[in-house]
Amino acid sequence: MSRFHSYLNAAVAILKQYDGAMPFAANLKQFFAANKKMGATDRRQISDLCYSFFRLGKAGLHLSVDERILAGKFCCTTDDDALLQAVKPEWNSIISDNIVDKLKLLGLDVHEIFPFKDALSDGIDGELFSLSFLQQPHLFIRIRPGNEEVVKRKLLHAGVNFKELSPLCLSLPNATKLDRIIQLNREAVIQDYSSQRVGALLEKLIPRKIKNVWDCCAASGGKSILAKDVLGNINLTVNDVRETILYNLKKRFAEAGIKSYNTIITDLSQRGIEQNDQFDLIIADVPCSGSGTWARTPEQLYYFDKHCIEKYVQLQKSILTNIVSSLKPGGYLLYITCSVFKDENENNVQFLTKNFSLQLNEQIILKGYDMQADTMFAALLSKPYG
């Protein structure tokens, strides 16, 4: 048996015991920890085959596990591949063909990969979004103000190829070990391209002299650091539902040089906070389906049930209901999701304008599927005076 067949058999074994209950990356880590004889090349090849299986999304569900792995590998690969040459040489001979033609050869339809086109937000191209699952997204960093030259110089010195998408946004190879090259969070933050573009809405608030800011679903603090960099000297309050989440945030803030901020630990789906009419800006990067990021974790698409959307919508509405009273008259709510579903995006904006008399200033689909980046939604709303 060739090493390529061994890789395929290992991938089949891993996938047959995986049920989607934990992130697949963590599952792989456990498998490799239990099989220490596998070297770096073995781990890379097996991981690639497993992810090829998931990148087909909902397409080819009738195929056996090994057939689906190879079909995914064929669709996700554009250059001559040694494994395909050994196992499916007839496919390897046409490896550079158009991806839609490849799918047709396999009897698959591009729209089967992500079959929820009717649920998409307006303006998202269903076919292009489906095709984006067949490529691994890039790694992006946002250079923090004043560090542009030093970060680029360090990357060049380390021999890292990068693409400059804007003066502060760089796209890099996924395997780049940034922590060995730059001061992460101090000089630059790892932040997806679309997530960085939320800063354009924050920039519109610079003339408003925003002072008191509440990042109500702060997670690891990426939007808070962005707000600090864009808006300058703000009084920052961060909240999340668990102490462990804020522990990671505090570590990141320390690395970023952010020392002055307030913390709250509360479940905003159950209750609000006591500070009514306090904040000039509330950033609500709410829990969501994460569907705009699934090209990074394609197992989530494979296991996704459309009925789960409503669960997220109800959670989002509960959080929004409990935070609006903390917004000052004349203040702003920045609503953000990494979802592509209309119910989590535009429909929640309508919920806010209808039930809380908020005014919509701007909403935008941050398309990343044509840039090997995440796709997100952001809306800036304001609370009228009086």
Predicted features, each with a name:
Residues 1-386:
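S-adenosylmethionine
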